[in-house]
Amino acid sequence: MAKSYEYLHEFFEDVCNIEDRDKRIVFVKENAFKQAKTILQLCYNDKIKLDLPIGKPPYRPCPEGRTPSSLANAFKPIGMTVKGNKVRRLKKEKVFIGILESIHEDDANLLVAAKDGNITTFQKKKYSKITKSLVEAALPELLK
């Protein structure tokens, strides 16, 4: 039975806490939810890129004590920021900043890292076990 997650970073931390690669693959297959899959695609699918500058944009993290938006609601407009979308670049940046400001700060950092394709190297390699080969083995459809 799939585990339910309120935050993206909790899912990715759970994946990295599994030492055995085969068990990690099974865990990802059974527990990856839509927004986690979006992060994996942004990071490892060469056909899906966001039309945004590299690096962390200027934004205000979701304040302590305020409940972040649900991931499902927060991620709805992310398609507007994809390369090839006819939305103006400034609007894409505003949409992306809006997403970052509405989610948990750790999830926002994860999303920025995925956008830049460096999920395995940011935050002192916290998510180094989430590699392209892991995604290929667990969810190959995300890379097609």
Please state what every model-predicted region is:
Residues 1-144:
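N-terminal nucleic-acid-engaging modules of covalent nucleotidyltransferase systems
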